[in-house]
Amino acid sequence: MSTPDDRHHSLPRRRFLAASGAVLGLGALHALTGTAASAAETPQWRPGVRFAPARNWINDPNGLVHFQGEYHLFFQHNPDGDQWGNMSWGHAVSPDLVRWQELPVALEPDELGEIYSGSAVVDHHDTSGFFGGQPGLVAIYTSAGDTQQQCLAHSSDRGRTWTKYEGNPVIPNPGVQDFRDPKVFWHAPTGRWVLLLAVGDRIHVHGSPNLRDWELLSEFGAGHGSHGGVWECPDLFELPVDGDPGRTKWVLIVSINPGGPAGGSATQYFLGDFDGTTFISDGAPDEIRWVDRGADFYAPQSFSDVPDGRRLWLGWMSNWDYAEEIPTDPWRGSMTTPRQLGLTDTGDGVRLVQQPVDELAAVRSNRRAWRGVIGTGRSPEFSGTSLEVLATFQPGAARSFGVDVFAGGGHRTRIGYDVAAQELFVDRTGSGTALISPAFPARHATPLAPTGDRLPLRIIADRSGVEVFAAGGRAVLTDLVFPDRGSDRVHLFADGGNAAVEVEVFDLTP
């Protein structure tokens, strides 16, 4: 996990969520806090379908796991303030990845230090010996005191209460500064648990039969990918290519801060093979593959034990360049919409693809649709502040085309495609409250070569952020925005010529 100071030097990190039994999702601020909104509070920016805590600071998602009918989201949280510090594990649960209930803080600092990022697993066969032969939840996290060390906690009551292991730390610090963010999963072919650890700008792989006794197996990272900042929050999982179970690749996820393509923090990935001991990348050492080229997708983690086998994840929707300055109150920080992952073969090789989870369709309402030509004459206008937009464009002679969201009062967030540059972009320079930091107002873009005469866009515009998925999720941009009150219009645009479009717009109402 990163800290605000990782831009200059590396320090330990911390965690999140306030204790509340309220169901989050509609931005019902009074129900969440039990108090009247003050003039400083900003309910207009509380996400509708993305998770945000009732109050105070959050950053990285931690311990994502499904167990006994619930998705668990733990997260870095400061229960006592809206700045990074006093890191604890906040906790929320959901039956469907859309409607979240915030629970009391799960893990608090102790004599070993603050509670930094980590993961959680279901110990189905009680390999740890914590559960008397029954399944239970085990959290693996970094304790950050004088040094960073890896520790365990376990729960026998569906994650409601936790007992820290008396033998902590299970992986002591070997004398390095950055030694954190354990990600654990069961590797069936070798019959053992595997743990990934971010160590400086490397990933260490450990193995264990019981979650308590760990052996260092291998190291990855020298000369591979981006080393513009400290490496953090690793993840590793296997995915089929284009859904073919006979053709799979392992995906290694590494977040870095700083060094991202949009400035500040970002997440890269590597494709390759993993035999339970060693990850071998199949890409050129100097090749850098970014998960998301927007500014605000960091430290993603995937869920363990998803019942139908999908690989699902979410990330922290912020950037360390300005995370402590975003203008929301009484909370600071939110997560992205959960996404489902896949691999697809493109003209440039196999690439990671992302789409919002299928569960999001259940909260669609108020469908509006239009088909026609834009660029000359009047185009349709829609409205809303928590929306899903599905648009398929045929460019025609247009030089650029796309969708403006959160428009009105001279402001807009422009999402579009530049035909000549062959790039998808989000322009938030005119999005409203932009001057929270010199790094904030910007245009972010990602390469996207055309694959035919149509470009499908899927946009989640949820009150204080946009998530854009193009061409089946081959190109993704995630950006925070803070529109002014009344900036709730959606327009289609085409510059330099006409473009044909088919569009559907849905309200998102959990």
What kind of feature is each model-predicted range?
Residues M1-L11:
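N-terminal secretory signal peptides
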Residues P4-D5, T33, L492:
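Juxtamembrane helix-loop transition sites at the ends of transmembrane segments
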Residues H9, R15-T35:
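N-terminal export signals
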Residues A39-P182, W186-W231, P240-R293, M317-W370, ...:
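Beta-rich carbohydrate-recognition and catalytic domains
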